Amino acid sequence: KENKRLKDILPKNFARPELDKRRLGEVVDLFTNIQMIEHGNSKDILGRTYEYCLSKFAEQEGKLAGEFYTPSCVVRTLVEVLQPFNGRVYDPCCGSGGMFVQSAKFIENHGGNINKISVFGQDSNPTTWKMAQMNLAIRGIEADLGKFNADTFFNDCHPQLKADFIMANPPFNLSGWGADKLVDDVRWQYGTPPAGNANFAWLQHMI
């Protein structure tokens, strides 16, 4: 109730009969017993815990995890190359928001001011979009991820955005992405992307 950003984001089924109450209690105890003072501030601890859970979930999901999770080592490399100290940071397929989290960490680690960046993104998957909202809210990162999950090709949440930094790990080699309905799209300045592969479409959208 205290965080308006998470309204309608968090699940409301914690009381459902099939949920293992003992397991839920163990999870609550785990978070409750963390010694915040010894390991950092509460936002940092909760953020790292959430990131750890995402990575473990990704391990279980295997190849399917690519839809929402990019390994932190890959994201760190992208961020360190671009060095987004200030300006508009954009990810058109933001997954769980890893690019934004690492950007914030980079700025903090280099003595920068996180308030000098503006974060924009979106994701088509409703669950993944909610994961990103939670990931950023936990860390206190302000972001515009659209009012709801949306397909970037068919419902661009930021059509007028002129981003200073674009970081993304799009679903490569995506087929059946709806090319036939976007033949005359104004984004295809360098040619119409092939119907069987969305890679060129992603590149042109970002450009």
Regions found by a protein language model. Name each.
Residues 1-85, 144-157:
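Non-catalytic, mostly N-terminal accessory regions of nucleic-acid modification and defense proteins
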Residues 26, 64-67, 121, 191-195:
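Alpha-helix N-cap/helix-initiation motif
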Residues 64-168, 173-180, 184:
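Conserved S-adenosyl-L-methionine
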Residues 78, 129, 193-207:
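Conserved Class I SAM-dependent methyltransferase catalytic core
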